[in-house]
Design a protein with these regions (language model features):
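Boundary at the C-terminal end of the N-terminal hydrophobic targeting segment
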Residues: 12-18
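Bacterial N-terminal signal peptides
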Residues: 2-10
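Right-handed parallel beta-helix
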Residues: 82-89, 113-127, 143-154, 167-180, ...
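Short glycine/acidic-rich loop motifs that flank beta-strands on beta-rich extracellular proteins
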Residues: 70-74, 92-98, 128-135, 156-163, ...
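Short, recurring structural edge motifs at helix starts
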Residues: 69, 104-110, 195-202, 227-230
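Acidic Gly/Asp/Thr-rich repetitive segments characteristic of extracellular carbohydrate-active
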Residues: 25-63
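N-terminal extracellular ligand-recognition/capping segment immediately after the signal peptide
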Residues: 34, 56-97, 125, 129, ...
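Short, T/G/N/S-enriched strand-turn elements that build extracellular solenoid repeat scaffolds
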Residues: 43-54, 70-79, 109-112, 160, ...
């Protein structure tokens, strides 16, 4: 297993240089990338490296030293890769429409082949109330993805995280806090479990095995779920376990065309509605 580490050097006059190094199992430095507080290029190059070198026999990790950073361009995730944010605070500073992290989109990906075995953990992703109306994290056609111990903050007229036609995705011990939106013009689920039709997804199942566990949803318009449906096409095996929903403007859980649902151990505090269910569009 190879590990990609990020370290920072702080100079007395306030200028910061971040070094992103590629290190093998023997702790030999293979590659080094440098940046200031704008970590976009360094992270992008690290992800390019994992894209070209990670595989099921060689799982790689990108580790960022603790700090506050800006991302000014969408970073595309790679398979067989973990990103350890290491308690860092990363802000969306995109001047145009764009996410902080997104699954690959450089070609057509049938089934669940866009992204597999990917982990993001241990840090904060701040939407920064960026007016580009983009999700902080967007995953499509992805499989075996885990988001753990990540705080999502301050989304503007979109979702903190959006899943579109994914399988085996888990959010564990995450926080979703802060949102500006308008339910008259935007659906506003903090975690949207969306759906793609056959044109996008070649007729394959929309969702399977999505787990939201030990998470906190606070000061958002809607918590988790979807508002879209296609007749006779279900999202299956959805689990929402031991979560806390607090100060929810509308609905904490929106389950439209969900099948084989497990919802238990959740707390609802100051929510307009705890849960909404609609089967097959009815």
């Amino acid at each position: 297993m190879c590990i990609i580490f990020a370290s920072c050097i702080f100079f007395s006059y306030g200028f910061t240089i971040c070094s992103v190094c590629v290190i093998n199992e023997n702790k030999n430095v293979l590659k080094s990338y440098y940046s200031t507080s704008d970590i976009t290029t360094a992270l992008s190059r690290a992800l390019d490296y994992t894209k070209n070198n990670a595989n099921k026999y060689n799982f790689l990790t990108i580790r960022i030293s603790k700090g506050v950073y800006n991302v000014k361009k969408t970073l595309h995730l790679s398979s067989y890769t973990a990103i350890d944010l290491n308690k860092s605070f990363i802000k969306n500073a995109n001047y145009e429409r764009g996410n902080i992290f997104k699954s690959p989109e450089d070609k057509e990906y049938p089934k669940y082949s866009s992204l597999t075995r990917c982990i993001i953990k241990n840090g904060t992703l701040d939407g920064n109330f960026n007016r580009n109306k983009s999700c902080i994290l967007r995953l499509c056609h992805s499989n075996n993805v885990k988001i753990e111990n990540v705080t999502f903050l301050n989304n503007y007229y979109s979702h903190h995280a959006e899943l579109a036609s994914c399988q085996n995705v888990t959010f564990y011990n995450c926080v979703f806090n802060g949102q500006l939106s308008n339910l008259n013009v935007n659906s506003s689920e903090a975690v949207q479990i969306d759906i793609l039709d056959r044109v996008h997804f070649f007729g394959f199942t929309s969702y399977d095995n999505i787990t939201i566990e030990n998470c906190v949803f606070k000061n958002v318009y809607r918590g988790v779920g979807t508002h879209n449906y296609f007749k006779n096409l279900y999202q299956t095996n959805i689990k929402i376990l031991n979560c806390t929903f607090e100060n929810i403007t509308d609905c904490a859980i929106s389950a439209v065309n969900f099948k084989n649902i497990e919802v238990k151990g959740n707390k609802f505090l100051n929510c307009k509605y705890s849960a909404f269910y609609r089967d097959n569009g009815k």
